[in-house]
Amino acid sequence: MSNASFARPRALAVRSKSQSAALNQRATTTTRASSRRSVLARATPNDALRKSQAMEAIDACVTSSDLGFGEKYEGKVRDTYVDGDKMVAVTTDRQSAFDRHLAYIPFKGAVLNQTSQWWFKQTEHIVPNAVVATPDPNVTVMRRCEVFPIEFVVRGYLTGSTSTSLWTHYKNGGRNYCGNELNDGMVKNQKLPANIVTPTTKEKEHDRPISLADIVKEGWMKQEDLDYCVAKTLEVFAYAQEVAATRGLILVDTKYEFGRDADGTIRLIDEINTPDSSRYWLSDSYAERQAKGMEPDMIDKEFLRLWFAERCDPYKDEVLPEAPADLVAELSSRYVKLYEMITGETFEVPASSTDVNERMRNALKGVL
């Protein structure tokens, strides 16, 4: 990952009185679950329709961008354009996992970008963010920030499928992960006694897990900045878990990134609580499936990870099997479903005949 100085477009057990008040004030968007479900039932297309729309758009994915200004940095999913004190993040339909590209997923970029913007607005009472404007479904304009070289991964459950996942570490006998002590006798997908932060470094080749103590010891961050980011990570995550619960969802884990702007303010950057950066499970079936030793009903990219992991070694094999169209459409459908469950809004399918780059350039006029 690049360490350039810009924001890449990509458990608190008790709330304070002000936080509780803020949560109550957002009743129309974050509580009143029964009302939300009734609205959602009327507004959301069924799964078959979502999947059909995705199948029709497989050949019209946003695979790259060309906005024609500033310095361009191409990441795994986002293209970033830096110009002056602002940056533009274009979220594409590229799908990555295991540190490599896997497929293109219809509508993924728009879903991720719009999901992030919804969460940024919902959490700005907890921590400031870098968002300036969202002029296009795939585009966000952000303040330019100096990015802290640490990803703040936060977990509420013992799960995962990658080589660096908490579950992989645990099943291989590890009982300390990034400085967090883990109890014996736990099983996969079990809820942890409390949310934990398990940071990773942001490096060019491979990120690596690191303890909070080593972050300071190795000079990645100053203690004061680290303490602030850890506290905000736990606070935002706990709040988001409560919101997700009112939508029939379990927010399992996620990652947050922070940066410092020109005025010295530490801001939440990149993306927040998206199906790319997070795991979500359906809550109504979790207990029953867990009791039977079954995987939870997943509504994120984890099932795509599992598909590849069952058919190859995605870390070592030079050539990976091609994800079938039905699998790609299913993931797209799940992403859209998650967006609609979280926001209560119907996802608007972008017109496939539109020149995406022209659309984005026009949307940015008057914003930059």
Predicted regions: what is each one?
Residues R50, A54-E203, P314-L368:
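Active-site loop/lid in soluble adenylation, ligation, and acyl-transfer enzymes
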Residues Y256-E302:
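Catalytic activation segment of kinase domains across protein kinase-like and atypical kinase folds
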Residues M221-V252:
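A long amphipathic alpha-helix within ATP-dependent nucleotide-binding catalytic cores
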Residues E288-L331:
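C-lobe/activation-segment region of protein kinase-like
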Residues N138, A244-D261:
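A short glycine-rich, hydrophobically flanked beta-strand micro-motif that places a catalytic Asp/Glu
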Residues M1, A33, R37-M55:
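N-terminal mitochondrial targeting presequences
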Residues M1-T30:
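N-terminal chloroplast transit peptides
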Residues K191-Q223:
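A short mid-domain helix/strand-loop element embedded in enzyme catalytic domains
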